[in-house]
C-alpha cells in the first residue's frame, strides 16, 4: 500500500500546527510508528530534556518542506514518503525545523533506525527539563496523534509533484484527445480516398471498355458495298420494268388478236395445223411439247418451200403465212429444255429441206451457240468487232436488207454442212432475231424470268420484215434454271429487248428511230442501218450499235479502256475526214499533254481555226477524276467549248460519228451530278460523292485504292 498519510495536529501555545506525513506500508510497520503508538511508555518513565523552540516541536521527523525530490534507487518508499508540510496560518515556523539524521529506509533496514532512536531517547533523558511540562506535552502529543489516526481524513492539500503530475496528465489527455481527433480525420480521409480510388477504377474500367469497343470498330476493315447486291437490285428493277411493258403489250395483243383467230385459221391451208391449233385452244395450253415442235417444223418447212422458188414476188405472202401459221408461240422454237429431246424429230421432219436450203441463194448470218459468254469480273464493259463471218453475212443495200425474210428462219437455213442447225435452242433463235443489234450470243438465263421468250417471238416481224406480226400471243412461263445474268448483260438486254417491242396495231415501235445514214460504218462491206433505244432525255443507254460485241474479259486498266474507246469513237465517215483528223492528232501530240500524262486527241486544228471546229470536238479520253469530266461538261477545258454548250447549240450532230459511245457513258456522270444539284446539293458535293464511291480496300495488301472511271460509269448504268 502506497500513498497513505497521517495528519498530526500539534498544539503549541494556542497555535495549531498540522503536519502531513506521507508514508507507505513499510513505513507504517517501522519501529518509529510503533513508538508513536505507545504514549503510555512516555508518560511513565521517559523525560525529554531537549530544548524545544516555542514555535516547533522536535519529534525526530524531517518536517521541512522539500525543495527537490530525489528518489532512492530500488525503493518505492523513499520516493513517496519524504514530503511533509508544516503551516501555521499560512506562515512558516520561526525557529526552523529539527531534522533527524535517521532516514526511513526500506523494510530490509528496520533494525538500524530502532537503535538510533534508542540512543537519542537515552540522551534526552539527561536533559534537565520541567517534568510536568514534559509530561503534559508528551501526553497531549500522544492524544493528538491518536485522534489524528482515528478521526482525520487524508489531506486535502496537493503536493507540487502531484500538481505537476496532474498538469502533465491533463496535457497528455488533451494531446490524446487531439491525437484521437487527428486520427479520426485521417481515417476519414483514407476512407474517402479509398472510395475515390474505387470510383476512379470503375470509371476507368468503363472508359476502357468503350475505348476497346471503339478500337475494335476502327480496326475492323470497312465493309465494301457488295456489288452483287447492286447488280441484283438493278436486275430486279430492270426486269420489273420489262415485265410491266411486256404485260401491257401482251394484253393489248391478246385483245387485238382475239378477233383475228378465225382469219388465221383460214389462211393456214393445212388440216393438221387446224386440228393442232384447235386442240391447243381447247386444252388451254396443255399441248404436248413434242407434238407442237413437230407441227412447227412442218410449218417452217412449208414456209421455206414457199420462199425458195420465188423470193422477191412471194416474200410478203410467205411472211404473212408464217406469222399466221404460228398461232401459239407459247411453246415455239425457243423452248430450251426440250431442244435435245426434239432434235431427232426436227431432223425427221426436215430431211427433205436440206438440199433446198443448200440451193438457196440467200446468205444468212451464222448464229453460233457454241461460243460461251465470259463476263469480266470487274464489271468493265468490253467490246469487240464482229467476226469476219458476220461482216460477210449481208451483201445487199439498205433497201434489200429491209425486205429480207425474217431472221428467225436463220437457224433453219444456216446449215450447209450438217443437221445440227436444226437444233431449236433459245440462244440460237434469239441471236438470230437480235443479230441486227449485235446483242449477246447466249441469253438462256433470261428464261428464269419468263419475259424474254414472250418478247422475242413478236420481234420476228419487227427487225426487217415489212408485214405486221400475228398478234394472237399468249405469254409463256418457262422455268429454266440457268445462271443469272450479270450486271452488264442485263443492261444490254434491256436495251436490246426494248427495241423489239412494237406499240399499237401498226407493228412498229415508235421509240425505234433510224439514225442518219451517214452514221453507218464504212469499214464494213455493207452499210448497216442502226437502231437504238432513245430514253426520255435523248441519249442512248446502249452503245453497242456500231457492230461491237461483248468479248472476253480483259484487264481493267485505264490504258486498255482508253484505247478501246478511242478506236471505237474515232471511226470517220470517209477517207478525207480520216486524213484530216490524223494530221490534227499528230499536231496535238507534239504540242500538248493531257492532265494525266496521256496525250489527248482533239478535232480542232492547231495551225488555223476552223469554222465548224465545234462540230469536230472530241471528248476528253481517259480522265483520271470526276472533276475534270464535270469541268469539260460545264465550262470547257483549255478554251474548248463545253459539252453543255454543244448540246444546246448542235444537239447530237457534234457526236454522231466520234463521241457517241463516250458521251453515252459520260452522260451517266452528268445526270448523277445534275440530279444532285436539283435536290439542293452542290456540284462539288456530288463530285466528292462519286470520288468516294471509287475508293475500295484491297484484300491482298489492305491498301485503299481507287477504281477506274470506267467502273464508275458502269456502276451508274441504272441512272
Curated annotation (Swiss-Prot):
Phenotype for residue 410 to A: Impairs HOT1 phosphorylation
Effect of residue 30 to A: Impairs HOT1 phosphorylation
Compartments, as annotated in UniProt: Nucleus
Biased composition, class Basic and acidic residues, residue ranges: 117-127
MF GO annotations: DNA-binding transcription factor activity, RNA polymerase II-specific; RNA polymerase II cis-regulatory region sequence-specific DNA binding; RNA polymerase II general transcription initiation factor activity
Biased composition (Low complexity): 128-143
GO cellular component, as recorded: nucleus
Region annotation (Disordered) ranges: 68-90, 102-159, 353-402, 496-610
Compositionally biased region (Acidic residues): 535-572
Residue spans of biased composition, Polar residues class: 68-88, 144-159, 353-369, 387-398, 496-522
PTM comment text: Hyperphosphorylated during acute stress.
Function: Required for a complete transcriptional response to osmotic stress, through recruitment of HOG1 followed by pol II recruitment to the promoters of GPD1 and other HOG-dependent genes.
PANTHER family per the UniProt record, alphabetical: HIGH-OSMOLARITY-INDUCED TRANSCRIPTION PROTEIN 1 (PTHR37784:SF2), PROTEIN MSN1 (PTHR37784)
Name this polypeptide is given: High-osmolarity-induced transcription protein 1
Record organism: Saccharomyces cerevisiae (strain ATCC 204508 / S288c) (Baker's yeast)
Encoding gene (name): HOT1
Amino acid at each position: 500500500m502506497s500513498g497513505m498519510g497521517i495528519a498530526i495536529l500539534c498544539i503549541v501555545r494556542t497555535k495549531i500546527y498540522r503536519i502531513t506525513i506521507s508514508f507507505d506500508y513499510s513505513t507504517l510497520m517501522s519501529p518509529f510508528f510503533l513508538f508513536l503508538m505507545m504514549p503510555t511508555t512516555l508518560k511513565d518513565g521517559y523525560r525529554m530534556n531537549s530544548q524545544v523552540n516555542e514555535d516547533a516541536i522536535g519529534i525526530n521527523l524531517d518536517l521541512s518542506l522539500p525543495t527537490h525530490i530525489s528518489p532512492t534507487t530500488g525503493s518505492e518508499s523513499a520516493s513517496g514518503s519524504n514530503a511533509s508540510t508544516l503551516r501555521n496560518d499560512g506562515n512558516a515556523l520561526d525557529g526552523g525545523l529539527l531534522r533527524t539524521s535517521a532516514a526511513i529506509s526500506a523494510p530490509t533496514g528496520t533494525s538500524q533506525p530502532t537503535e538510533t532512536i534508542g540512543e537519542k531517547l537515552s540522551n534526552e533523558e539527561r536533559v534537565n527539563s520541567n517534568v510536568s511540562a514534559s509530561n503534559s506535552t508528551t501526553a497531549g502529543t500522544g492524544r493528538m496523534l491518536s485522534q489524528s489516526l482515528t478521526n482525520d481524513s487524508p489531506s486535502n492539500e496537493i503536493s507540487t509533484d502531484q500538481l505537476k503530475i496532474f498538469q502533465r496528465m491533463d496535457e497528455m489527455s488533451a494531446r490524446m484527445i487531439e491525437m484521437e481527433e487527428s486520427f479520426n480525420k485521417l481515417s476519414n480521409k483514407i476512407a474517402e480516398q479509398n472510395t475515390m480510388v474505387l470510383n476512379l477504377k470503375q470509371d476507368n474500367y468503363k472508359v476502357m471498355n468503350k475505348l476497346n469497343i471503339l478500337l475494335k470498330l476502327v480496326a475492323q476493315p470497312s465493309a465494301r458495298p457488295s456489288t452483287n447486291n447492286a447488280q441484283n437490285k438493278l436486275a430486279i428493277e430492270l426486269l420489273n420494268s420489262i415485265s410491266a411493258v411486256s404485260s401491257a403489250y401482251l394484253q393489248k395483243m391478246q385483245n387485238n388478236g382475239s378477233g383475228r383467230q378465225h382469219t388465221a385459221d383460214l389462211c393456214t391451208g393445212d388440216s393438221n395445223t387446224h386440228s393442232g391449233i384447235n386442240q391447243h385452244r381447247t386444252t388451254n395450253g396443255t399441248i404436248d411439247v413434242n407434238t407442237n415442235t413437230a407441227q412447227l417444223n412442218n410449218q417452217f418447212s412449208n414456209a421455206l418451200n414457199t420462199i425458195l422458188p420465188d423470193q422477191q414476188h412471194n416474200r410478203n405472202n410467205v411472211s404473212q403465212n408464217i406469222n399466221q401459221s404460228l398461232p401459239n408461240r407459247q411453246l415455239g422454237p425457243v423452248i430450251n429444255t426440250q431442244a435435245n429431246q426434239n432434235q431427232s424429230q426436227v431432223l425427221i421432219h426436215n430431211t427433205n429441206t436440206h438440199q433446198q436450203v443448200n440451193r438457196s441463194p440467200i446468205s444468212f448470218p451464222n448464229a453460233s451457240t457454241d461460243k460461251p459468254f465470259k463476263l469480266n469480273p470487274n464489271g468493265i464493259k468490253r467490246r469487240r468487232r464482229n467476226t469476219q463471218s458476220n461482216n460477210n453475212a449481208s451483201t445487199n443495200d439498205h433497201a434489200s436488207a429491209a425486205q429480207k425474210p425474217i431472221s428467225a428462219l436463220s437457224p433453219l437455213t444456216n446449215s450447209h454442212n450438217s443437221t445440227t442447225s436444226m437444233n431449236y435452242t433459245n440462244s440460237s433463235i434469239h441471236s438470230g432475231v437480235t443479230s441486227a443489234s449485235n446483242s449477246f450470243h447466249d441469253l438462256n438465263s433470261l428464261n428464269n424470268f419468263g419475259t424474254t421468250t414472250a418478247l422475242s417471238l413478236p420481234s420476228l416481224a419487227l427487225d426487217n420484215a415489212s408485214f405486221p406480226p400475228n398478234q394472237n400471243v399468249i405469254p409463256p412461263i418457262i422455268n429454266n434454271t440457268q445462271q443469272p445474268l450479270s450486271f452488264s448483260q442485263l443492261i444490254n438486254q434491256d436495251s436490246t429487248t426494248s427495241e423489239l417491242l412494237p406499240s399499237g396495231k401498226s407493228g412498229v415501235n415508235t421509240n425505234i428511230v433510224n439514225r442518219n445514214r451517214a452514221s453507218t460504218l464504212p469499214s464494213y462491206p455493207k452499210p448497216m442501218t442502226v437502231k437504238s433505244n432513245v430514253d426520255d432525255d435523248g441519249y442512248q443507254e446502249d452503245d453497242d450499235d456500231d457492230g461491237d460485241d461483248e468479248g472476253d474479259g480483259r484487264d481493267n486498266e485505264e490504258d486498255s479502256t482508253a484505247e478501246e474507246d478511242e478506236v471505237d469513237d474515232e471511226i470517220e465517215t470517209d477517207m478525207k475526214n480520216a486524213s484530216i483528223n490524223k494530221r490534227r492528232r499528230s499536231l496535238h501530240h507534239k504540242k500538248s499533254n493531257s492532265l494525266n500524262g496521256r496525250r489527248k486527241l482533239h478535232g480542232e486544228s492547231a495551225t488555223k481555226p476552223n469554222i465548224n471546229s465545234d462540230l469536230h470536238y472530241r471528248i476528253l479520253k481517259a480522265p483520271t477524276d470526276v472533276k475534270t469530266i464535270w469541268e469539260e461538261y460545264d465550262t470547257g477545258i483549255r478554251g474548248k467549248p463545253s459539252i453543255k454548250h454543244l448540246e444546246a447549240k448542235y444537239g447530237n450532230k457534234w457526236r454522231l460519228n466520234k463521241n457517241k459511245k463516250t458521251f453515252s457513258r459520260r452522260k451517266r456522270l452528268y445526270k448523277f451530278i445534275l440530279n444532285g444539284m436539283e435536290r439542293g446539293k452542290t456540284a462539288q458535293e456530288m463530285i466528292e460523292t462519286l470520288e468516294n464511291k471509287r475508293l475500295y480496300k484491297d484484300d491482298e495488301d489492305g491498301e485503299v485504292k481507287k477504281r477506274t472511271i470506267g467502273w464508275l460509269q458502269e456502276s451508274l448504268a441504272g441512272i
